């Protein structure tokens, strides 16, 4: 009996011992877990309760042009915060802050008396002078945190290319958005000990986690040439009154974007954030993201393709009665009476639709679509910019012969301005389709290169032999034909004009896009320039008048800036003397108009039986040689 009691007691003691041992083991395991596994997390949580932090904004990187001129930089500002639990006189603080910061008193007061918040931001990016003024008032509970504000020294220059940032210095559009991860840097913190109510504990040291400045961008843009382009586009907006206009200047040998602009624009230091529609419309980089039917400027690509494929030769002749009939449809040339017999070169210089219908049909649908791919049409080119368009190509399987015929002269196909200038550049640079780009390099604050872009040949489009032929052709267009408004005595300029009808709901709208693509120097181009005006509403809508003269303005400024020497000046001056500027005869009585034009040495063709001139082609203002034909519509 006694033995049984002892045995039972031993079992109970053992159970108690095991239980106590298990509890101690659990405590040890828990302590180990808390100390070793969760220690860092718990320390951080404690720090959050006992430390109050202020952000230290990283300085955003500088954006500079190819010569080091700063296009976007940051300067120091301050964010004003209030710690409600430290405020001694809420009314006084609200009154002073609202007055000096230009804010509503009631809104500031409501923030200050909200004791549930340990800290509240009153206003961001306040200038240093204003902050010093506030500091001098010795307001308890008011603290400042250093920040940065973006500044664009050139105002409305490169509006769509550079883009802008939020007040928090986050890229919102343009290169500021595309390269935001490089530009933004890493923010730091200023930490100070505080009690449970958020008040700073006296005699405690602050801790700092320093910010890391953003990296700097070095662009392909030359700000001087950018100024030339924007001046020309501003002139175009005033004189030709288009809805918008766009310009791109490319180095055809590297793909570097030397200048790019769209008008209208806005000052990047005063972004119209309150007008969302205006902001969206004027922030859109039309040169990269929009598409249009290129019209006659596209004929250069068709011509180069035909010569390269061996289906067209300089010795070929074409007869143009004023139209071609394809699939039962009549495709008219702009000159309704036709150009008659002409050479291949004359076909381009005359911008004769019939010739390019023939060339497109000689190439055929398969080769035409192959050429589109070769030129980078229907796909993006990989430029370092958000929203790049790949253009629009009709589905090959549904394209009819008449569609292919129209593609030959730039209809039934849509491209972005960037695609057109890149493809055009390949025609005059020896046949290399270069990838376009904006940023040459990314460097850290010490100047170390973190990223560097080298010219990239996407593919070969044509042979150097074909390229040489095309360079000569486009120079002839400028010397004696529709591109003469870009002619500069003593300098070799090439180019092709374009006038495109716009369609709305499948019908001709009566609105136009006028364009010009120019090359300089024509024999070995350093620059290819595209000028495009959407819906000009001045005295003309032809590319030769609306776009070409403004490309000439840019080239003339580049000549002075880069000190290009003149050549064959005397011969070119004689050529100018032989040319005539077409007068405006629209609205004149037909007999008077004919007499005026004939007195200038021009031939006249009349379409219609009216007594007054309703429309004329060649357009007023265009420079042409004597014996050129002006078509008057009555």
What do the predicted segments below correspond to?
Residues 451-452, 537-541:
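Short small-residue beta-strand/loop micro-motif enriched in glycine and branched aliphatics
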């Amino acid at each position: 009996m006694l033995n049984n009691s002892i045995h039972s007691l031993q079992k109970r003691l053992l159970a108690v011992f095991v239980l106590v041992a298990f509890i101690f083991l659990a405590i040890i395991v828990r302590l180990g877990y808390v100390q070793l596994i969760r220690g860092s997390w718990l320390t951080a949580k404690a720090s959050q309760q006992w430390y109050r932090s202020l952000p230290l904004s990283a300085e955003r990187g500088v954006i500079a042009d190819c010569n080091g001129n700063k296009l976007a930089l940051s300067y120091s500002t301050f964010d004003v915060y209030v710690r409600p639990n430290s405020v001694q006189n809420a009314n006084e603080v609200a009154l002073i802050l609202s007055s000096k910061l230009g804010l509503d008193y009631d809104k500031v007061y409501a923030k200050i008396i909200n004791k549930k918040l340990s800290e509240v931001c009153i206003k961001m990016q306040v200038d240093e002078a204003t902050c010093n003024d506030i500091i001098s008032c010795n307001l308890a509970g008011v603290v400042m945190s250093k920040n940065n504000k973006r500044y664009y020294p050139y105002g409305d220059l490169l509006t769509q290319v550079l883009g802008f940032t939020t007040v928090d210095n986050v890229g919102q559009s343009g290169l500021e958005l595309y390269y935001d991860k490089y530009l933004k840097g890493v923010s730091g913190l200023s930490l100070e000990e505080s009690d449970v109510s958020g008040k700073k504990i006296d005699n405690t040291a602050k801790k700092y986690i320093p910010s890391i400045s953003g990296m700097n961008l070095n662009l392909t843009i030359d700000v001087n040439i950018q100024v030339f382009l924007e001046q020309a586009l501003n002139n175009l907006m005033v004189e030709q009154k288009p809805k918008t206009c766009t310009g791109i200047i490319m180095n055809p040998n590297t793909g570097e974007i030397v200048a790019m602009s769209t008008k209208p624009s806005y000052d990047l230091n005063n972004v119209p954030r309150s007008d969302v529609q205006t902001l969206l419309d004027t922030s859109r980089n039309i040169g990269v993201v929009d598409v249009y039917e290129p019209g006659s400027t596209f004929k250069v690509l068709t011509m180069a393709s035909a010569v390269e494929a061996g289906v067209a030769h300089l010795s070929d002749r074409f007869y143009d009665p004023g139209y071609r009939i394809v699939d039962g449809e009549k495709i008219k040339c702009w000159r309704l009476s036709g150009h008659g017999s002409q050479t291949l070169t004359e076909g381009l210089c005359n911008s004769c639709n019939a010739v390019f219908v023939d060339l497109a049909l000689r190439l055929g649908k398969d080769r035409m679509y192959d050429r589109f791919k070769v030129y980078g049409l229907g796909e993006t080119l990989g430029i370092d910019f958000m929203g790049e368009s790949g253009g629009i190509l009709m589905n090959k399987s549904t394209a009819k012969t008449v569609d292919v015929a129209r593609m030959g002269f730039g209809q039934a196909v849509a491209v972005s301005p960037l695609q057109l200038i890149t493809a055009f550049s390949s025609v005059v640079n020896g046949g290399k389709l270069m990838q376009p780009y904006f940023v040459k390099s990314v460097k850290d604050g010490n100047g170390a290169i973190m990223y560097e872009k080298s010219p990239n040949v996407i593919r070969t489009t044509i042979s150097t032999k074909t390229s040489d032929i095309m360079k000569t052709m486009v120079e002839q267009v400028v010397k004696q034909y529709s591109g003469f408004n870009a002619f500069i005595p003593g300098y070799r300029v090439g180019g092709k004009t374009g006038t495109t009808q716009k369609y709305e709901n499948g019908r001709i709208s009566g609105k136009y896009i006028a364009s010009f693509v120019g090359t300089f120097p024509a024999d070995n181009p350093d620059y290819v320039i595209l000028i495009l005006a959407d819906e000009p509403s001045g005295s003309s809508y032809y590319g030769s008048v609306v776009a070409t003269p403004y490309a000439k303005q840019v080239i003339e400024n580049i000549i002075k800036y880069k000190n290009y020497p003149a050549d064959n000046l005397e011969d070119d001056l004689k050529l100018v003397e032989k040319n005539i500027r077409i007068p405006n005869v629209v609205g004149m009585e037909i007999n008077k108009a004919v007499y005026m034009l004939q007195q200038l040495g021009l031939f006249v063709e009349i379409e219609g039986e009216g007594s007054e001139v309703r429309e004329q082609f060649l357009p007023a203002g265009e420079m042409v040689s004597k014996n050129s034909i002006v078509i008057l519509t009555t």
